[in-house]
Amino acid sequence: MSDPLIKRALVSVSDKTGIVDFCRELSSLGVEIFSTGGTLKALQDSGVKAASISLITGFPEIMDGRVKTLHPKIHGGLLAVRDNADHVAQAVENGIGFIDMVVVNLYPFEATVARPGVSFEDAIENIDIGGPSMLRSAAKNNESVTVLTDSADYPCVLAEMRSSGGRTTRATRLRLARQVFQLTSRYDGAIARYLTGAEGAAPAAAETMTVKLERELDMRYGENPHQSAGFYTLTDGEGTRSFGDYFEKLHGKELSYNNMLDIAAASGLVEEFRGEEPSVVIIKHTNPCGVAQAPTLVEAWHNAFATDTQAPFGGIIAFNRPLDMVTAEAVNGIFTEILIAPSYEEGVLDLLMKKKDRRLLVQKQALPKGGWEFKSTPFGMLVQERDSKIVAREDLNVVTKRQPTEEELGDLMFAWKICKHIKSNTILYVKNRRTFGVGAGQMSRVDSSKIARWKASEVNLDLHGSVVASDAFFPFADGLLAAAEAGVTAVIQPGGSIRDNEVIEAADANNLAMVFTGMRHFKH
C-alpha cells in the first residue's frame, strides 16, 4: 500500500505548544481540520480554519466534555483498513469518512497528581478517556494514519508532508505509533499507581518487583577503562523504555557509559523548561555548570556559558528549541562531547558534523515523568519514586516580612527547577533567569555556598540582586547570612530545620524575602 494522502486531521490537545502554527501549516497543505473544546477555540481565535468534531459525529460534547470523541464515526474513520473492500463498503454505508491524522496529547494526569495537596476529585477529572482511545485506534492503523503526541514531532512531520505532496513515510508512522503505546502504557501505569496510593498503600513496599533488562547498546567500557559495561532497555510495570525511544544519534563516536549518565542529566534538566522561553543547559560530570533562559537561543547560550567559562569544555549541551545556525556557530567555538536538541535547522548539521567525534543527538519525545528509579548496591537494589513532584508558585510559603517581587519570584522558580538536578549539598545563585554561581556536591552547605560565590567572582558576575536556592534547609543562619553578604535579595529553600525561626529572623534583619517549598531535593 502506498503512503496515503493526509486529507483530514483530528486535533485535540491539552498542551497547546506549537499547535496553532502546526495546524496553520496543515491547512495550507490542504488538510481539513476537526477539533474539540479548548483546542478548537484556540485555533479559531488564531484564524486557523477548523471545524467542530460534532460535524463528524452529529452529536454534541456532553457531560462537561467527558464524552466527545467516543463515537463510531471517529473510531471507524481511524480503524478502517483502506485497502479492505468490506471496510470501505461499511464506511460508505454508515457515512464514515476516513481520518488520516490524529494530533492528541493527554490530560496532564501525572503533573496534576504531582502537585502537593491535589484532591482526589481533581485527579480523577484529569484521567483522559477519549484521548488514549483515539491514540490507540490511530496507532493500531499506522499503515494509514499518522498520529502525533508530542510537539517536538511537528517539524519533521511537516517537512515530510511538504516534500512528499502531503504524505508521511511508513517509517515515520511506525515510529510515532510506537510512541503512542509507550505513552498510554506509562499513562495507565501512573493512574494505577495513584489509585493504589489513594487507598493508603505504599507501592514501593511491594514484596516483589519484576524487571526485565535487554542489552540495547554495547559500550567499550564503564566509568573507567577497567570496568565492562552495557546499556539495557528496561521493562517493568510501567512498560518498556529504551534509549532509542527517546533519542536518535545523528553523528559522532559511539556513546560511552559516562556519556549516557550525562545525557540523562542534561535531558532531565532541559525537560524542566519544555514549552518555555529558549533555554540552554550545560552539563559536566552530571552537574549543571550553566543554565539560562532568554528571548533567543543564542542569548541563552552566551548567558549559560558565562556562568563558568572553563567547565563547558568537553561538556554536554542541551537545548529546548531547534538548534539554529547563529547558536550553532557560537557553540561550535568550543569543544563539546554531545549536543542535544529537539531538531536542527537547515545547514546546522553540515557545520557541526565537521567535528567528527562530537555526538549530535535529537531528543524525539518528552522523557517520562514519575515512575521508579533503581540504584544497585553490592547487597541489593534500592527502589524509589523519581524526584518529579512539582512546586508551583501557589505552593510557596512566604515566611519573611517582605514578600518577593514578581521578578524575584521568577528567578526563585527558575532556580528551584535547577536546584534538584545538582548533587547535594547544593547552593545556587540565579539572576535574570541565568545561573550566576553553582556550589555542588560538598559535605558542608557553607562550603557549597563559598564555592558558588567564588565561581561567580572568577567570571566577574555580580551577585547583588540575585536570588539563592538551597536543596535542603539551612541548619544555621550562617549560610543565609553569607548569601546576604554576597548581595542576595531573596531565598528559596525547603524549610524544616529546628532553627527555622533563627534563619527567618536573619532574613528579616537583612530585608530578604524568603520562601519555603516544603520539599527537599537531596541528590546523591
Swiss-Prot record:
GO biological process: 'de novo' IMP biosynthetic process
Pfam families reported in the protein's UniProt record: AICARFT_IMPCHas, MGS
One Gene Ontology term of the molecular function aspect: IMP cyclohydrolase activity
Manganese is among the record's keywords: no
Pathway(s) per entry: Purine metabolism; IMP biosynthesis via de novo pathway; 5-formamido-1-(5-phospho-D-ribosyl)imidazole-4-carboxamide from 5-amino-1-(5-phospho-D-ribosyl)imidazole-4-carboxamide (10-formyl THF route): step 1/1; Purine metabolism; IMP biosynthesis via de novo pathway; IMP from 5-formamido-1-(5-phospho-D-ribosyl)imidazole-4-carboxamide: step 1/1
Substrates-to-products reaction catalysed: (6R)-10-formyltetrahydrofolate + 5-amino-1-(5-phospho-beta-D-ribosyl)imidazole-4-carboxamide = 5-formamido-1-(5-phospho-D-ribosyl)imidazole-4-carboxamide + (6S)-5,6,7,8-tetrahydrofolate; IMP + H2O = 5-formamido-1-(5-phospho-D-ribosyl)imidazole-4-carboxamide
Xref: InterPro entries: AICAR_Tfase_dup_dom_sf, Cytidine_deaminase-like, MGS-like_dom, MGS-like_dom_sf, PurH-like
MGS-like domain sequence ranges: 1-149
Keywords: Hydrolase, Multifunctional enzyme, Purine biosynthesis, Transferase
An annotated GO cellular component: cytosol
EC annotation from Swiss-Prot or TrEMBL: 2.1.2.3, 3.5.4.10
Origin superkingdom: Bacteria
Entry comment, domain topic: The IMP cyclohydrolase activity resides in the N-terminal region.
Protein family (similarity comment): Belongs to the PurH family.
Full protein name: Bifunctional purine biosynthesis protein PurH
Organism: Chlorobium luteolum (strain DSM 273 / BCRC 81028 / 2530)
